[in-house]
Amino acid sequence: MSNTEITAKTQADEAHSFAEYEAIATALLPYIDAAKTGDGELSRTAFYDHAHIVGSVGGEFSYPDADAFAENVSQIGASPDVKSRIAWIDISGPAAAAKVEFINWSGLRFTDFFVLYKTDGQWKISGKVYDSHSNN
């Protein structure tokens, strides 16, 4: 076997790895889509019930639970011009971390860091730390 050949095990491992990245990106979509639509209930589906959320908007520290955060998303309403990107995803077994950036979510720029965990074959957000930056 030459050094350039990929073994069947490596192919299977890499296919699984790619699938996990896609599954995590999919798990983040309800949250990302809620920024655009203002649908707090959609955002809520991305979080475990026990999820911890901490961060700041305009320098004001906040630590809402997942239900209160969903209410905030609904109150803010739709931001149809929001832009977002998943900057990175890092996975270790059933645990993962992700960074998502938003521009123009209700006129603000946000950086969100997520901790996700996979149970029963499903990835969900267990924790979120965020910060708003200066207006776009």
Provide a role label for each language-model segment.
Residues 51-52, 134:
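Short secondary-structure capping/turn micro-motifs that flank functional sites
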Residues 49, 94, 121-122:
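Beta-strand-connecting loop/turn residues
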Residues 19-23, 52-109:
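Surface-exposed, charged secondary-structure patches
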Residues 47, 102-104, 129-130:
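Short beta-strand segments enriched in hydrophobic/aromatic residues
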Residues 43-44, 55, 127:
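Hydrophobic residues in well-ordered beta-strands that form the structural core
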Residues 1-41, 45-49, 62-64:
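Short, low-complexity N-terminal intrinsically disordered segments enriched in polar/charged residues
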Residues 2-5, 109-136:
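Short beta-strand edge/turn micro-motifs at domain boundaries
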Residues 47, 59-60, 114, 132:
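Sparse recognition of residues in long alpha-helices and their boundaries
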